[in-house]
């Protein structure tokens, strides 16, 4: 029994170590010390440590490619990671939002919009967390702009901004609601 506990502890520690090393890679990107090519190679090396089909590893591969500007290569990894159903709520939201952003960049605007609306609708379900809610609204606003729907984009962006204003927040929220059909407040 103790041996089983030790193995489980070792697996948990290894997963935590992997997460820490992935976080360190992204910190080095923030400090601009890694090129896109080096980022992809580094993340791929770390992802190779995980089991084939590991959702977090596929997600990190997608992120690396997205950050490196090779969105077409990121798309499949995002889709595969999401399809497993094994991402935690935060990574799942990130994957949905980032896939939608990638699709927007690739010109697949309708699918980008559909993904973001589905993500935002999930946030409104009772008991569901709302990680990155405003971020999803921001990317949807960008998708609206790309679709030529600037009025709706402004409404969505202003509805996200309104609660943070020190003054005029009710007025801005009311006007924002007049510009867009749904704000996901």
Regions found by a protein language model. Give the residues of each.
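N-terminal alpha-helical interaction modules that lie
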Residues: 1-56, 61-72, 85, 163, ...
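Alpha-helical linker/edge segments of TPR/alpha-solenoid repeat scaffolds
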Residues: 32-37, 72-73, 101-111, 142-153, ...
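Ankyrin-repeat and related helical/solenoid repeat scaffolds used for protein-protein interactions
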Residues: 121-153
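TPR/TPR-like (Sel1-like) alpha-helical repeat modules
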Residues: 117, 121, 145-167, 177
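"A position-specific structural signal for the A-helix of alpha-solenoid helical repeats
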Residues: 59-60, 98, 138-139, 174-175
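Alpha-helical adaptor scaffolds
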Residues: 56-130
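Tetratricopeptide repeat
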Residues: 37-44, 75, 82, 113, ...
């Amino acid at each position: 029994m103790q041996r089983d506990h030790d193995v489980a502890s070792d697996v948990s520690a290894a997963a935590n170590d992997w997460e820490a090393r992935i976080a360190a890679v992204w910190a080095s990107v923030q400090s601009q010390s890694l090129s896109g090519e080096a980022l992809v190679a580094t993340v791929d090396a770390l992802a190779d440590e995980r089991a084939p089909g590991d959702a977090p590893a596929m997600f990190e591969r997608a992120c690396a490619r997205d950050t490196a500007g090779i969105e077409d290569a990121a798309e499949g990894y995002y889709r595969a990671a999401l399809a497993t159903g094994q991402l935690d709520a935060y990574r799942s939201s990130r994957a949905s939002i980032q896939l939608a952003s990638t699709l927007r960049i690739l010109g697949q605007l309708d699918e980008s919009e559909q993904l973001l609306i589905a993500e935002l609708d999930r946030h409104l379900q009772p008991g569901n967390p709302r990680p990155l809610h405003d971020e999803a609204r921001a990317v949807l606003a960008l998708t609206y702009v790309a679709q030529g729907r600037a009025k709706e984009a402004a409404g969505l962006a202003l509805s996200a901004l309104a609660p943070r204003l020190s003054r005029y927040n009710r007025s801005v929220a009311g006007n924002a609601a007049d510009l867009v059909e749904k704000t996901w407040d």
